[in-house]
Every structure is written in C-alpha cells, then in structure tokens.
Amino acid sequence: MGLTKREEKILNSIIIPSENDPNKPEFPPDNPKFPATPTYQIKIPDFSNVWLKDESVNPTGTHKDRMAWEMVVTYKQFLLAKKGGAIKKLPKLSILSSGSAALAIQNQLKKYNLPDLNVLMDISTKKEKIDYLRKIGCKIFLIKLGNKILNWEDILNFTKNKDGFDVTSNEAYDLTVRFYDWMSYEIINSDADYIFVPFGTGQLYENILNIIKKELNYKSKDPRFKGNYEILKKTSVLGATTINPKSKAEKLYAPFLPFANYSKQWIKYYRFTGITGKMSSVYNLKEEFLEKAMDIARKQSINCEPSGISGLALLLQMKNKIPKNSKILIVNTGKTIMDI
C-alpha cells in the first residue's frame, strides 16, 4: 500500500543521528546532547561526595521522556514497514500508566502527528490527571486494578487495542537495553561507588545492570562508556521501592505491573559473578525517610516528587551502611506538571 504523503512527511521528520555514537546523540530530539541531563553535587548530612543525576529537565519533566522518544523511533520502523508493504496501517500503542509515562509518550506522538496513545489507569486515579491526559489526546480506559499482574494481552484487551502493541511490559520490546540505554551510560560514567535509583516498573534499574554487564563481559566496548572499569566492577546499584499502598511514593507501589524480569535470584547471580557490587538489590523504603528526602530536596531547589527522589530516601535510610566518603549518585527521575 505504501505511505500517504502525510506519512512520508512524518517518516522524514524523525531523525536518528546514531545508535550509540556519543558525538551524534539522539536525545532530546530537538537538541541532542550527551549527556542529555545534568549531574551536579548536592549536600547531604554526614556525606562528602553525593551527586544528583537530574532528569527533571526533560521535556515533560521525567526520565520517561527517554522512553517516549524510543516510541517515536519505533514508529519510524513501522512507517518503513508500511512503505515496504509489510503492514497496511500503523498500529496503536497501549500502556498501563500512573500518568508520567503516558504524558511523555503522548507528548512525543502528538509532536510527530502519530496515532494517539491508549492508556489503562486505575479507577482511583485523580480526575485532574485523567482530564489532563484526555486533553492532550490520550484515550483513557479505567479499571479497578488489584494485585493480579496484568500481561500484555490483558492490557491490549482492556484498552480495546487487540491489533496494537503494549509498551508496558518487556515482551514486544527489548526494554531492558533500549529505552534507557543512553541514560544508563550517563549514570555509570559518573564512576560512583553507589547508585541509588527509584524502582517502579523496574525497567530503569534492570537497564543499568544490563549495561554494566554488557560493558564488563563483552569484548567490543560501547563508545558511550567513559568510566573506569575497576570502579564499575564494584559499583552497587540500589533500587528503592515500597510495599506500602498508602505511600507518598505512589509510582513505586504497583503490584499489578508487568515488572521487568527482576528477581532476587537474578541479582544474586550478578553479585556472585562479579558483575555488580555487594549491596546491589532492591530495598523497601520506610515512609519517614521520604519526608526527610523531600525536605532536603526543597532546601536545595531540586525539582522532584516522592517517587522520583526515593533514591535519596533510601540513602538516608541506609546511611549507617554506606561509607561516608564514598562517591554516591542519586538518580532523580523528576516530576511532571501533573504531580503539582
């Protein structure tokens, strides 16, 4: 069938400078640079060398903008397939989201005149958030989410998109080394002894560890890696999550999500084979430390919300187990306009 004139124009507008050349980065699409977001030192009581990776400067305010760009890249592949006659029409995408990923993806789809996003949300989601997403073009589907893990088929069925693709799970995409690969290199290039990162869907956490594994195990090295291999071998990556359904870090509590392939056995294997540091794991947060982290963030004008700054909360919770003079990187995944 080929492409319409409109689709041909969209195809030509999606520019991908390179897959992994640090001198030809792909994100953010309007002004690509590597690193794409800043890392700067912050003051934390009792610690002397703490740095913040700040994703709040992204287009919609969170690290999900990186995932959103990859959706545009995916649509370029769809367009090329349609141009070659492999498919007859562009598929729609569906996602299970608390809001930030849906906002970021729809923002990019709208910018490139691509099909609007189908979004599955919990029926308890704030009306203001639902209204905002609808306003920018998302098609919202509300259900009561329980503890049952939803797979990609469930999500497509609930969003009435049986011929489309679910981008929540990792079954159709290589999420663990694709959505956040550039970001992961920016993170490990810091040569930190300890990296603290929010663990919601698990995609970012797993991506970081898989990039570390790739760098330590593969003979061919990625040109984006500028760090120290000896430090990387010992770097511990600590994920912050919660089992509290009433936590202010609401994006970290989602028992129904099709998580990335995180398991204690998997991370134990990485530790035992020398791929990651001894403290690499996912830890449950105590709510009191979220309050302390937010207080520190406010005093230093860090743009964040509780889920995004949960890595700092975990550091405060574990402060007696972390050497005070070690280099520490806190990943702030940011805050959207809907988190105000």
Please state what every model-predicted region is.
Residues M1-I340:
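PLP-dependent amino-acid enzyme catalytic core
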